[in-house]
C-alpha cells in the first residue's frame, strides 16, 4: 500500500478549493458578527462523557474514540460542534440573558453521511441561547438563508419540521416509546413498510398518526391536512401553529413542510429546519431548537441554531474565488521592496515572479503589474 494513501472519504484540500473555502469562511463569520454573534473556539478533543452529553445515539456512533495517554480516560474527536457550544454557554459563560455565539472548525465522522460525503467536514454555525420565543427561531433561519445567499445559493428550499409532534405521539403511547430508535429511523428514512410493521400493535389513533407523518409533506397548506389527520393534542396543535407562523415569515426561500424530516431528532426539542438547493440530494444546512441540551451541562437554556459544512457549500457555490493579484519582478532593489510592502499593507496580493518561473502562476489572475517608470515603481493594468 502506498505510504501517502489517505483513508476512505478523507481528502486533502488543494489551493484553489482552500482559497474558496477560506474566503467563504471569512464572509460568513463577518456576517454572523454583523448580527451580534460572538466567536468561540471549542477544543477538537474532549472527554467522551462531556462530548456526547445530550447528543444522542447517532452522535455516539459518529464519534471517533481514543485513549488519553495522560489520564487513561477515553477521549472523543468531535463530530459536531453544537453540543460543545451549548456546554460553553451553560457551564462557562453562565450569562442570564440572550447570548449569541458562532464558530467554525473541523469535525470528524466515523462514517460518511452520504455516498460521496467527506468524513472530515469544516462545520460553521451560529446559536442563540436564552430566548424561547419564535423570534429566535426566525432570526436563526434568516441568518442561515443570508449565509447561503452570500455563498451564491439564491434558490433555496426551506423544509420545516417540529420535534414536538413525534414527542407528543410517543408520550401518549408507552408502547411507541419502546420502539425508540427503530421508529425514528423508519420515519427519518420515510420507510413506510417498516413503519407499518413497527406500529402494527399500537392503539389505532397513534398508529394512524405515525403512519401519516411521512405523507404530510408539501407547502404550508399541508398543515391543514395535519390538523385533520393527527390527534387533537395541545402539544401537536402548538407545534403546527409554530410551523404556520414561521412559514408565513420566511423571506427569500420556498417553504415546505415535512413532518417526517427528523434527522437530528435525538437532541432537538422544537422547530427543525433544513435547506436544500437544486441538484444536491442532501441538505446543505440544518438547524433547530434544542432547549434541553444545556440542562445536561447543569443549566437548562432555551437554544436554537444552525450549521453547515463549508467544504460542501464551497463546492457547489457558483461564486468565483480566483484571486486577482499584482505581478511584480524579483530584483534586489530597495525601492521595489518598499513598494511591494506598501501594497501588501494596503491589502493587495503582490506576487514576485522568481527568476525562470514567470509562467508558473496560473492559480492567480494577474490584472495589474508593478513596473519601474522614471525610477519609481508604479502599478499599471496588465496588457
UniProtKB/Swiss-Prot annotation:
One of its GO terms (cellular component) is cytoplasm. Pathway: Amino-acid biosynthesis; L-histidine biosynthesis; L-histidine from 5-phospho-alpha-D-ribose 1-diphosphate: step 1/9. Keywords: Amino-acid biosynthesis, Cytoplasm, Histidine biosynthesis. CDD domains: HisRS-like_core (cd00773). NCBIfam families: hisZ_biosyn_reg (TIGR00443), PRK12292.1-1 (NF008935), PRK12421.1 (NF009086). Heteromultimer composed of HisG and HisZ subunits. Required for the first step of histidine biosynthesis. May allow the feedback regulation of ATP phosphoribosyltransferase activity by histidine. This is ATP phosphoribosyltransferase regulatory subunit. It comes from Paraburkholderia xenovorans (strain LB400).
Amino acid at each position: 500500500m502506498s505510504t501517502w494513501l489517505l483513508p476512505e472519504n478523507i481528502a486533502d484540500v488543494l489551493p484553489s478549493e482552500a482559497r474558496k473555502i477560506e474566503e467563504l469562511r471569512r464572509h460568513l463569520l463577518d456576517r454572523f458578527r454583523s448580527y451580534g454573534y460572538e466567536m468561540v473556539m471549542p477544543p477538537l478533543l474532549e472527554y467522551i462523557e462531556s462530548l456526547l452529553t445530550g447528543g444522542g445515539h447517532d452522535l455516539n456512533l459518529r464519534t471517533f474514540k481514543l485513549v488519553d495517554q495522560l489520564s487513561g480516560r477515553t477521549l472523543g474527536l468531535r463530530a459536531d460542534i453544537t453540543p460543545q457550544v451549548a456546554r460553553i454557554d451553560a457551564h462557562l459563560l453562565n450569562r442570564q440573558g440572550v447570548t449569541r455565539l458562532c464558530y467554525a472548525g473541523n469535525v470528524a465522522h466515523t462514517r460518511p453521511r452520504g455516498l460521496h460525503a467527506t468524513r472530515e467536514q469544516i462545520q460553521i454555525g451560529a446559536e442563540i441561547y436564552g430566548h424561547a420565543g419564535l423570534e429566535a427561531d426566525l432570526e436563526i433561519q434568516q441568518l442561515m438563508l443570508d449565509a447561503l445567499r452570500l455563498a451564491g445559493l439564491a434558490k433555496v428550499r426551506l423544509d420545516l419540521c417540529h420535534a414536538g409532534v413525534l414527542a407528543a405521539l410517543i408520550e401518549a403511547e408507552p408502547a411507541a416509546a419502546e420502539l425508540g430508535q427503530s421508529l425514528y429511523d423508519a420515519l427519518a428514512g420515510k420507510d413506510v413498510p417498516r413503519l407499518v410493521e413497527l406500529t402494527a400493535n399500537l392503539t389505532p389513533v397513534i398508529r394512524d398518526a405515525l403512519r401519516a407523518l411521512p405523507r404530510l409533506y408539501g407547502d404550508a397548506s399541508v398543515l391543514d391536512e395535519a390538523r385533520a389527520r393527527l390527534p387533537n393534542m395541545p402539544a401537536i396543535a402548538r407545534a403546527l401553529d409554530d410551523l404556520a407562523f414561521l412559514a408565513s415569515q420566511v423571506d427569500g426561500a420556498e417553504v415546505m413542510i415535512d413532518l417526517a424530516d427528523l434527522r437530528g431528532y435525538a437532541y432537538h426539542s422544537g422547530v427543525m429546519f433544513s435547506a436544500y438547493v437544486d441538484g444536491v440530494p442532501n441538505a446543505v444546512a440544518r438547524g433547530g431548537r434544542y432547549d434541553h441540551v444545556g440542562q445536561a451541562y447543569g443549566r437548562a437554556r432555551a437554544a436554537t441554531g444552525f450549521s453547515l459544512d463549508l467544504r460542501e457549500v464551497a463546492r457547489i457555490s457558483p461564486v468565483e474565488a480566483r484571486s486577482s493579484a499584482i505581478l511584480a519582478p524579483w530584483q534586489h532593489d530597495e525601492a521595489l521592496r518598499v513598494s511591494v510592502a506598501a501594497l501588501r499593507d494596503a491589502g493587495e496580493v503582490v506576487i514576485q515572479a522568481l527568476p525562470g518561473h514567470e509562467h508558473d502562476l496560473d492559480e492567480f489572475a494577474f490584472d495589474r503589474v508593478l513596473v519601474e517608470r522614471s525610477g519609481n515603481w508604479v502599478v499599471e493594468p496588465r496588457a
